[in-house]
Amino acid sequence: MNRTVRMRWLKGMYLANVFISGPIGLANLVAPDVMRALMGVPPGDPVHFGLGAGAIPLAFGIVGALGLRLPGRMAPVLLIQALYKSLFLLGVILPQALRGSVLGFAIPLIVLFTLFILGNVIALPFSHLFARMPRQDLAEP
C-alpha cells in the first residue's frame, strides 16, 4: 500500500476514534445509566464492563485527535486498540457464542469492534512499527 493511501487510512481511523470511541467513552463516564438504557444493557452485564466503562474508548478518542496531527507517532495506540478489541472478542464474546448465549445488544458492539480491528490492521504501518531502532536511539531521552 502506498504511503498516501496508508496515511489516509491512519487519519480515517483517528477520526473514527475521535467521533465514535471518544463520545461513547465520555457518555459512559458521564451518563452510564443513560448509555445502558440506550444500548439495552442490564446493570452489571459483562459486555458493558468489558468496554472498560468508558475510560478506554474516551482515551482512544483523545489520542485519535493527537493522531490526526502526528499519525506515525500515534500508530502504536491503534495497534493496542486492535489488540484489546480482538482480545475482548476472543475472551468475552467467543465463549458466550460457544455457549449460545450472546445477548442481542452485543451484536452492534461486535460489528463495531470488528470494523475497528479491520480498519486498524489496514491502516497500521507494521514495517514502521516493528523496524529495528539503532542502539543510540534507545539511549536518548
Regions found by a protein language model. Name each.
Residues M1-M7, F130-P141:
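Membrane-interfacial, low-structure loops and terminal tails that flank and connect transmembrane helices
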Residues M1-R8, G40-G44, H48, R69-G72, ...:
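Juxtamembrane loop-transmembrane helix junctions in multi-pass integral membrane proteins
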Residues T4-V47:
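Membrane-helix boundary elements
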Residues M13-A16, F49-G52, P76-L83, P108-V111:
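Physicochemical signature of membrane-embedded alpha-helices that form the seven-helix bundle of GPCRs
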Residues G22-P23, D45-R69, A82-L90:
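Core segments of alpha-helical transmembrane spans in multipass integral membrane proteins
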Residues N28, G64-L68, V92-Q96, N120-L124:
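Structural signal for membrane-spanning alpha-helices in multi-pass inner-membrane proteins
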Residues L90-P108:
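Membrane-helix boundary connector in multi-pass membrane proteins
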Residues I107, V111-L138:
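Membrane-water interface at the C-terminal end of transmembrane alpha helices
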